[in-house]
Amino acid sequence: MEKRIAFWFCVLCATLSGYAQSSSLQDYVTSVRAKSCAPVDYVFKLFEHSDIVVIGERDHRDTTQYELILDILRDARFAEDIGYVYTEVGCVNRTKDVNRLLQGKYKTAQAFNDALYAYLRNEDFNPLWDKYNRVQFLRGLYEINRSNRHKITLGLTDCKFSWNKIKTAQEYRDFDDSPACAYRDSTMSLHFAEMYPKQKPKNGKRKALIITNHPHALNATFAGKDYHRQGKWLKELYGEDNVKIVMLNCTEYIQKEQMPLVASGLWDAAFEVMGCQPFGMDIKETPFGREPYFNARYGDLKWEDIADGIIYYKPIYELVLTIGIPGIVSIDFEVELMRRIRIYFEAMDRPVPPLEEAKPMYDRFLSFPGTYPQSPHSVRDTILRLMKE
C-alpha cells in the first residue's frame, strides 16, 4: 500500500512540475520586457565579455536578416573594436580575393559591380551561389569600408574548392565525398581557427563575428553520433563563456503545407504583443531558454542548451526569400556555366538541363514570402488568434 501511495505521489509531483515549467504568453512578454535591448546594442554588449559572437542565420534566402547584419557592421564600434567578420558562405581559398574586392578602389559603381560579379562566379562550390543576399551583404560591406578609415576584414570558412581544377563529374564526386565536405562543421571551425590567430588585435584583443546558418550555429552534437556542430566546436576551442551563440527568430522546419512556429507560436505572439519591436536578449533561465528545442536529432535539449541568446528581427510574416542574381550569367560566362552544370548534375545523378533552363536558375530574380508555402496573412492570423486565447 505504501509503495502504491509513493508511486502516485511521484506521478502527481511530475505532473505538477510539468505544469510549473510550461510558459504562458504573459511569461514570455514579461521576460522580454525585463531582459531585452536593441539588437545591435545586444551584440556589442556580448562583445564586452566575450571575444567571439556567432549569429545563427535563418533561411539562407532571407534578405531581411542582412539588413540587421549590415546595421551591426555599420556601427562605428564594429570597425574600431572588432574589425573581423566571418561567413559560412564562401570557399576559404577565396578569402584574399574577397578582401581585395571589399577594400579596393573603383572609379564608378559599375566598375565595382563588374568586379563583384567576377568574384561571385568563383566564390562557391555550387555552379553558382544563387542567394541574392550575398550580393546585398558584399555590396553593403564594400560601402561600409569605402566610407570608413577603419576597414572590416571578411573571412570565408567553407571547404577549399576551385572550379578551374574540376574537369569531370568524378572529380566533383571525389570532392563532395571528401572528409572536408562530410564534416563541414569541423572544416569551417578549423578554417576559422587558422585565420583567427592572424587577426591584428584591436585594443589588445582579438574579436570576431561569425555568421553561419542556424543548424551550424548550434551548441550541439547529433544524438548518438560523434558529429559536433560548428557552434559546439567553437565553444570547445575557445571556451563556453568566450563564445556566445545568438539565434535569429525563425520557424521550426518545413513540413508539407505547414511551417510550424517555435513554441507553437507563443514566441511570435509575444513579439506581436511587443509591437514587433526588434530586440536581443540572453535566454538562460528564462521561458525562452526552458523551451524544448524542436529538433530531436540532437537529443532532449532546451533552447538554453543550444544557444546563449536570441534576436528578434522582423515578424515571420515579413521575411522575404530571394534567389537569382540578375546579370550574373553574362554571355561570356554561358559556356563556363554549362561546363559546371554538366559536371555538377552528372555528379549528382540528375538530368543535365539545357542553357535556356539552367541560366534562369541563377540569374532570374525571384522573391517570395518567408512563410512559404503558407501565406503571410494566414501565419499572422494564427499569431493573432494566440494573442486572444
State what each model feature region is.
Residues 19-389:
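Structured catalytic-domain cores with a bias toward divalent-metal coordination
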Residues 1-24:
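Bacterial Sec-dependent N-terminal signal peptides
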